[in-house]
Amino acid sequence: MMRKLSPGSKIVLASHNAGKLREFSTLLAESGITVISAAELDLPEPEETEETFTGNAAIKALAAARASGLPALADDSGFCVSALDNRPGVYSARWGGPTKDMQVAMERVHREMGDNPDQRAFFVAALCLAWPDGETRTVQGECHGTVVWPPRGDHGHGYDPMFVPEGESRTFAEMSEAEKNAVSHRGRALTAFLNTCLDTSTQKTERK
């Protein structure tokens, strides 16, 4: 039988990114999952050596689960631009240089796109849930849209200010957290994660 998390479980988010911690905590709170960050536990960040989002998510989740003794959830996400052959992709954070400055990263995307009329882009989020014994479960979500320049908005993080999702006129960074979560790659991956990895039988029993 596939192992699942019970409501009330505590998991480690295998990330030192405060923005991601806030986003995941909000998304998982309704399901009764308590999230603590790898930074709180002072866990090291493993090197991401895979060429896929799911591969890198698994590296991070397994490292955090084994180090903490708790189930761990890792996300590996990236920005894929059609005109750049879907780069920066898994190297999205590295495009910000040694300090991962996302303003630098966005300027590089804009510079490399040049006058290319193809403005299509999409975000990918892969989530991996790992247990200390090495068992893993992986899901993925995508959100398609277009690149805009100059960047707009003060919310969100990463490449959010230069991306407008399909059906919207605002960038991710111009949306509220709830609005973004409803359509984002991470929100879609979380929905798949909850459907796949959360044991809802307890909740159903409690409602009766």
Swiss-Prot record:
Molecular function terms, GO-annotated: dITP diphosphatase activity; ITP diphosphatase activity; metal ion binding; nucleotide binding; ribonucleoside triphosphate phosphatase activity; XTP diphosphatase activity
Binding residue positions for substrate: S15, H16, N17, A18, G19, K20, S77, H157, G158, Y159, D160, K180, H185, R186
GO cellular component, one term: cytosol
EC numbers, comma separated: 3.6.1.66
Membrane-spanning intervals of the chain: none
A family per Pfam: Ham1p_like
InterPro entries for the chain: dITP/XTP_pyrophosphatase, ITPase-like_fam, RdgB/HAM1
First-tier enzyme category under EC: hydrolase
Reactions the enzyme catalyzes: XTP + H2O = XMP + diphosphate + H(+); dITP + H2O = dIMP + diphosphate + H(+); ITP + H2O = IMP + diphosphate + H(+)
Cofactor note: Binds 1 Mg(2+) ion per subunit.
Domain of life: Bacteria
Residues at the active site: D76
UniProt cross-references to PANTHER family, sorted A to Z: INOSINE TRIPHOSPHATE PYROPHOSPHATASE, INOSINE TRIPHOSPHATE PYROPHOSPHATASE/HAM1 PROTEIN
Oligomer and partners: Homodimer.
Task performed by this protein: Pyrophosphatase that catalyzes the hydrolysis of nucleoside triphosphates to their monophosphate derivatives, with a high preference for the non-canonical purine nucleotides XTP (xanthosine triphosphate), dITP (deoxyinosine triphosphate) and ITP. Seems to function as a house-cleaning enzyme that removes non-canonical purine nucleotides from the nucleotide pool, thus preventing their incorporation into DNA/RNA and avoiding chromosomal lesions.
Name of the featured protein: dITP/XTP pyrophosphatase
Organism, scientific name: Gluconobacter oxydans (strain 621H) (Gluconobacter suboxydans)
UniProt lineage: Bacteria, Pseudomonadati, Pseudomonadota, Alphaproteobacteria, Acetobacterales
